[in-house]
């Protein structure tokens, strides 16, 4: 268990999220489980699980059964709330107001053109997929303090000539 409190649903974004988010976050808070602990129990990446909680990812039938077990939510409730397609990209206002989320936005603002140029030089004309994609968050510690390490891994998709 982490020495930090578990993440809960922020009231300001709750109205923009599906009912499943409220159900999942309520159970997460009640059980005092981190996304890492839930991910381990479900057998998924913690970012994928968090995205599912925020309505930004689709749950498989296996995910639903595992979430039901770890969070003590009836499987029928999760099946009814998680069986549809996610409505991605609507949970945040732009630009973001939360300082941490804004820093991620700022990284793209500041380094996006540089990332694009370097990726084009390495791969050619195309884009990095956010569908054939994985990501993870790691914590590193050294003599200067604690560091957040975010890895983004997306399949390279070259533009087609036509």
From Swiss-Prot:
Pfam families to which the protein is assigned, alphabetical: Cyanate_lyase, HTH_3
Gene3D superfamilies, alphabetized: Cyanate lyase, C-terminal domain (3.30.1160.10), lambda repressor-like DNA-binding domains (1.10.260.40)
Catalytic reaction annotation: cyanate + hydrogencarbonate + 3 H(+) = NH4(+) + 2 CO2
Record-linked InterPro entries: Cro/C1-type_HTH, Cyanase, Cyanate_lyase_C, Cyanate_lyase_C_sf, Lambda_DNA-bd_dom_sf
Keyword annotations: Lyase
GO process terms (BP): cyanate metabolic process
EC number: 4.2.1.104
One MF term in the entry's GO annotations: DNA binding
Active site: 103, 106, 129
Family of this protein: Belongs to the cyanase family.
PANTHER family listed in its UniProt record: CYANATE HYDRATASE (PTHR34186:SF2)
Function: Catalyzes the reaction of cyanate with bicarbonate to produce ammonia and carbon dioxide.
Protein name: Cyanate hydratase
Species this chain originates from: Phaeosphaeria nodorum (strain SN15 / ATCC MYA-4574 / FGSC 10173) (Glume blotch fungus)
Taxonomic lineage of the native organism: Eukaryota, Fungi, Dikarya, Ascomycota, Pezizomycotina
């Amino acid at each position: 268990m982490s020495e930090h409190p578990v993440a809960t649903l922020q009231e300001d974004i709750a109205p923009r999220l599906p009912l499943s988010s409220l159900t999942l976050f309520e159970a997460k808070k009640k059980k005092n489980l981190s996304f890492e602990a839930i991910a381990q129990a479900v057998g998924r990446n913690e970012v994928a699980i968090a995205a599912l909680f925020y309505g930004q990812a689709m749950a498989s039938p296996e995910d639903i059964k595992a979430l039901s077990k770890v969070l003590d939510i009836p499987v029928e409730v999760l099946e009814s709330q998680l069986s549809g397609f996610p409505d991605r990209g609507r949970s945040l206002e732009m630009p973001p107001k939360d300082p941490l989320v804004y820093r991620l936005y700022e990284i793209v603002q500041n380094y996006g053109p540089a990332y694009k140029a370097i990726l084009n030089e390495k791969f050619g004309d195309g884009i990095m997929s956010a569908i054939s994609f994985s990501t993870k968050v790691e914590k590193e510690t050294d003599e200067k303090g604690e560091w957040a390490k975010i890895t983004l891994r997306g399949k390279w998709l070259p533009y087609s000539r036509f």
